[in-house]
């Protein structure tokens, strides 16, 4: 099924419909670039490259004030295909406009009428030539979908097959814009016929690993009332600015989001001290974060060891309590 939704005109254009369901799923040969379901561990996040400033834009154009006062979702959101069917959810391949870039990704949708809470999942930096759509974050997205969450997972700009915009020092503003555009499309389409028919806009969480954690923090700073809870996993939280330094990179003064921080103590990509310092800063702001540190674990937890299952267990419990609003008692 190939569907384009234009948010400007509110028109639904069905370009073509191809029914290719055999035993409830699309053959693997018909999928876009994809790993086997036993190999979604994929590449691990790597350090963000050092970039030379190439933009002629003034820093104010990357400010939170500008991001808060501009518009989003002024383009097309394409449901490219039903990508795969599982026992508890379906995965759709989607493409959407984000300013001058075309962003690819997928959406996991549980079966049933819902309403279902929503998680936006943001991957870390991986060498673009190594990045694939179903990478290491897929296992987390799938576990959340099986637990009854709609999961939106964009391939941010510069990560194939999404468009590669000019790289510049913009404090992750371009990536943040990609997320804010996705959020605008979700809001427009929620409750209407389509993959977001069962989405509950009152229950949204966000999850970010590595640079994805920094992007989540920027997004929360722009949308302080939107997210019920956030998971920051090995997050880049001190490199571009802090929540206390007044730099304008982050602003948590109005953020009411519940925050859970996770970091491996042997992380040689993003030092664990970044998350320890973030925990101290958030406590100074009376944000009462959860903070977990995992002995012997690297930047991306070893899938076959104790830490990754424990991290996922804590993730589900945290989102269930603060996004689903399920009491621990």
What is the predicted role of each segment?
Residues 25-60, 329:
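Ser/Thr-rich, Proline-interspersed low-complexity disordered segments
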Residues 255, 261-263, 267:
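Short beta-strand/loop motif that positions the catalytic acidic residue
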Residues 67-113:
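N-terminal cap/lid segment of alpha/beta-hydrolase-fold proteins
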Residues 195-209:
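Alpha/beta-hydrolase fold nucleophile elbow
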Residues 276, 285-329:
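C-terminal catalytic histidine-bearing segment of alpha/beta-hydrolase fold enzymes
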Residues 130-132, 219-257, 284:
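Mobile cap/lid helix-loop segments that gate and shape the active-site cleft of serine hydrolases
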Residues 114-116, 121-164, 239-240:
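Short substrate-entry loop that stabilizes the transition state in hydrolases
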Residues 170-193:
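Alpha/beta-hydrolase active-site loop
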